[in-house]
């Protein structure tokens, strides 16, 4: 029994230095691989943080509006930033070239300093994020009803005022509700050709007048 305990103690003592050595090895790998450090620090997104990003040098309008924006914000604390920008843009356009010239000179000086400080700087505009398209589809019932309404409105835009055309319209709706999509398209094309060659030569009012003026026919 004592021999078993001694062997277990020796095995634990051997494993402990191995665990410590593995910890030192993993820490050495962490410090010697800057790519993995950068990936973990940036959470894998590969983008620079806002502190490391180099900003563009200010132009003349930005130099002028830097102080003017504070004044407008203090005078109108309820005004939104977009409204302040619109007002500043209007005021800048109203200035003369002589009034704008000192701000152009200051902007040129700032651009020269920026060029000396960041000689390899290149402006890279940020792309706007595209809105994500919804993958949700309409239910089968609503999509079939919408398709049915579109087909009826497309092929039969005129108003049904007489009893004959009302009956035809109700018959068409029954066909649309009971037929398959391919049969619907074929029947619509055939009936549209028939109506365009016969009943649509005149207006619906003229057609109703003709139907009421003709005497009824009684077979003998």
From Swiss-Prot:
Keywords: Activator, Calmodulin-binding, Cytoplasm, Differentiation, DNA-binding, Nucleus, Sexual differentiation, Transcription, Transcription regulation. Residues 54-122 bind DNA. One of its GO terms (molecular function) is DNA-binding transcription activator activity, RNA polymerase II-specific. Gene3D superfamilies: High mobility group box domain. Belongs to the SRY family. Transcriptional regulator that controls a genetic switch in male development. It is necessary and sufficient for initiating male sex determination by directing the development of supporting cell precursors (pre-Sertoli cells) as Sertoli rather than granulosa cells. Involved in different aspects of gene regulation including promoter activation or repression. Binds to the DNA consensus sequence 5'-[AT]AACAA[AT]-3'. SRY HMG box recognizes DNA by partial intercalation in the minor groove and promotes DNA bending. Also involved in pre-mRNA splicing. This is Sex-determining region Y protein. It comes from Eumetopias jubatus.
């Amino acid at each position: 029994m004592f021999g078993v305990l001694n062997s277990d103690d020796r095995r634990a003592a051997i494993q402990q230095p191995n665990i410590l050595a593995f910890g030192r090895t993993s820490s050495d790998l962490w410090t010697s691989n800057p790519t993995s450090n950068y990936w973990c620090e940036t959470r894998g997104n590969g983008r620079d943080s806002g502190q490391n990003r180099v900003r563009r040098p200010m132009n003349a309008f930005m130099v002028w509006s830097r102080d003017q924006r504070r004044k407008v914000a203090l005078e109108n604390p309820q005004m939104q930033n977009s409204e302040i920008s619109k007002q500043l843009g209007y005021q800048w356009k109203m200035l003369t070239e002589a009034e704008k010239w000192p701000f152009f000179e200051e902007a040129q000086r700032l651009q020269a300093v920026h060029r000396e400080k960041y000689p390899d700087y290149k402006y890279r505009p940020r792309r706007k994020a595209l809105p994500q398209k919804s993958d949700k589809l309409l239910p089968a019932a609503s999509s079939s009803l919408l398709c049915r309404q579109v087909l009826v409105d497309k092929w039969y835009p005129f108003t049904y005022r007489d009893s004959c055309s009302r009956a035809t319209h109700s018959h068409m709706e029954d066909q649309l509700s009971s037929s398959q999509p391919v049969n619907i398209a074929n029947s619509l094309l055939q009936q549209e050709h028939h109506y365009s060659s016969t009943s649509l030569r005149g207006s619906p009012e003229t057609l109703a007048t003709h139907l009421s003026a003709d005497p009824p026919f009684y077979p003998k």
